[in-house]
UniProtKB/Swiss-Prot annotation:
Matching InterPro entries: NINE
Protein name per its UniProtKB record: Protein ninE
Organism: Enterobacteria phage VT2-Sa (Bacteriophage VT2-Sa)
Record lineage: Viruses, Duplodnaviria, Heunggongvirae, Uroviricota, Caudoviricetes
Similarity-based family: Belongs to the ninE family.
Amino acid sequence: MRRQRRSITDIICENCKYLPTKRSRNKRKPIPKESDVKTFNYTAHLWDIRWLRHRARKTR
């Protein structure tokens, strides 16, 4: 037995079932815990400059 070809309408309807509703798309995201937040290391650039200066002095 051959499988019957699906119509375009059937495929479109199947895809529409899983689209999120307008409300779920606009729902506010919960505020993450303090431990979950990744912060940028603001002193990294300063440490890099210091390390490069130290390295430059050492190689002379």
